[in-house]
Amino acid sequence: MRKLVEATQAGSEASVALAPSAPIQRLQAGLHHDPFEVLGVHVQPDGSKLVRAFLPAAEAVEVAGVRMTRVPGTDCFERLLPPGTALEAHPLLTWQDKRSGAWQRLRSPYSFAPQLGEMDLYLFGEGRHFEIWKVLGARVKTVDGVTGCLFAVWAPAVLRVSVVGDFNDWDGRRHPMRCRGVSGVWELFIPGLEAGHAYKYEILGRHGERVTKTDPYARQMFLRPETTSRVPDERPYAWGDAEWLAARTRFDWQHRPMSVYEVHPGSWRRRADGSFYSWRELTAELIPYVRDLGYTHIELLPVAEHPFDASWGYQVSGYYAATARFGSPDDLRAFVDACHQAGLGVLLDWVPGHFPKDDFALARFTGEPLYEHADPRRGEHQDWGTLVFDFGRNEVRNFLVANALYWLEEFHIDGLRVDAVASMLYLDYSRRHGEWLPNQHGGRENLEAIHFLHEVNAEVHARFPGAITIAEESTAWPAVSRPIELGGLGFSMKWNMGWMNDTLDYIEKEPVYRKYQHNQLTFSQMYAWSENFVLPLSHDEVVHLKKSLLDKMPGDRWQRFANLRLLYAWQYAHPGKKLLFMGGEFGQWNEWREAGQLDWVLLGFPEHDGIRALLRDLNRLYRDEAALHFWDFDPRGFRWIDCHDADQSVLSLVREGPDGAPPIVVLLNFTPVPRHGYRIGVPRAGAWCEVLNSDSMYYGGSNLGNGKPLYPAAVPWMGFGQSIEVTLPPLGAIFLKPCP
């Protein structure tokens, strides 16, 4: 305590006018590490109370009805109150604004005790606080009967952290925070602050660099181009999906139908003026549309906050903030709620592998690497121009694991599709020799990322029974979708990129050349049971000059539509869950453009509406027939009838269900030549009926098929004791089932 240089005046109060001490000078300069040492109420040995406040915008300040004195040359005001002076635990200060002259009232943040619990800080330091979003970030709460906002942020090894915002003129000297020791966490409770305020953190790094950052744990942010965090509304959302959540705990996803409609919410449909649909508008239009098509799930491209529309959400700046583009967090909750009440699950694309270099967000958060690995050979994706999380740092891993749980807990999301898993697993991913560092064993496997993925999957499955995790993993890494205890990564499912690439490469060829590439269709059965596969026709296949699915197809106009119908029939005949990106359901000609909307006008053309009708019926058949979904991940559900007819480019197969379920026989003709009297063996005697024909007139086809029951002859064929002769439509597929 510095020495008083002005004696106590007459009366019951004391005024102090002092030359600024070193602590006050550091406070004035924004360099003080511990503002609680200087500000607030300090009881003296004789029982007097020294009250200090730092108010750069104030002309005058009063406490307990007594004028405080400005410390010369500073914006610090103080008053020494004699022993026995009645003073609230959190005294109310009255101050006069320099600019307006108006008098205002506030309570000093520096009279409040620390708010974060030691156990919270310990668990966070251990990387095991899986509800950390309830601790860090901004939260409106009441402390000692005073309502305000508690801010908390992790920023280790820095000189100062301050809350700046629209409530303090973005002045980093106004609200410096309290450091919670070795945890590296800083906190401050600001009385009177309500939801809706804009804020950031100003950080003074250990080398003197000053950066201003959005809150990594912000649960709400302002619409781009703004980059500020927003104090969130704490009022709870009234969910109406309890029945869905209860049923989800019993959801047997391995044996249930699962067809996913992948959606970019910013470009599915737009208003007449080109602006985004809100979640409320999407609720009214998207949900009934998807339900009518028969899909079981909607998968949303990333909806966490991101600064750049053209990143599609894959370069995230606010991992805990639902993007402001489509409304409030509660609007997103209402969308998910409505999906559940309509019988639709909701999956979310999640991006834990990398983050952008934008200087307002996570990159060099303390003026130097914090969330990213410090060595660019591990900390940077050169191809994407992004940074890689330091998965080996407890607090960073905790940030990400808790974020996965956050979306499932706070938004009732039913599962996560994890983006770019391969880039996380390999230290040399897309790196040349000398541009990467091996692990401690000299290998290229990222052991820290593997541990992180284990932890994410284990916690998701333990805390949210029935929720699923899906890996976008493009290599042959083994056991991605196998349990951790069996040596796997613990994902529920994995995208089958091999099936997708081979199938599209095959079907883009002119039919006359397909017989030479027949193995591209059959090869997937060599590994089909090694993972729990999803068959994706995703957004990645209809961008960057790859063309839309319809525009990839060879031939004249009729053949292009027929080929696309055949592609979808092959997807639903093949074992594995299904995924299709929006626009594919009606055969959009253009590539996907995130800056516009789908070409809805095409539904006025019969061929396009026929594609949609086919997918509606494929989803119905897939859902209703256990043979087409029950053994999606088990070889008991699939058998080739004939996979060797390369000369005619025909495949025939049978899908089997559980005991008692009728089998489904599928034939696919990948040439424009009709096949009459085409004989195949069948697994059962008795009549067979055609239950779906991709060449039906209802789908825009030529209507060639098998309108009458097909009766087997006692002619052994292809390992079966009986066989039938069928008519195969050109570039068409037929699904047969034992007649009732």
UniProtKB/Swiss-Prot annotation:
Coiled coil: none
The protein's enzyme class: transferase
Tagged with keyword Nuclease: no
GO terms of biological process kind: glycogen biosynthetic process
UniProt keyword annotation of Plastid present: no
Subunit and partners: Monomer.
Entry function: Catalyzes the formation of the alpha-1,6-glucosidic linkages in glycogen by scission of a 1,4-alpha-linked oligosaccharide from growing alpha-1,4-glucan chains and the subsequent attachment of the oligosaccharide to the alpha-1,6 position.
Family note: Belongs to the glycosyl hydrolase 13 family. GlgB subfamily.
Name used for this protein in its record: 1,4-alpha-glucan branching enzyme GlgB
Organism, as annotated: Thiobacillus denitrificans (strain ATCC 25259 / T1)
Lineage of the organism: Bacteria, Pseudomonadati, Pseudomonadota, Betaproteobacteria, Nitrosomonadales
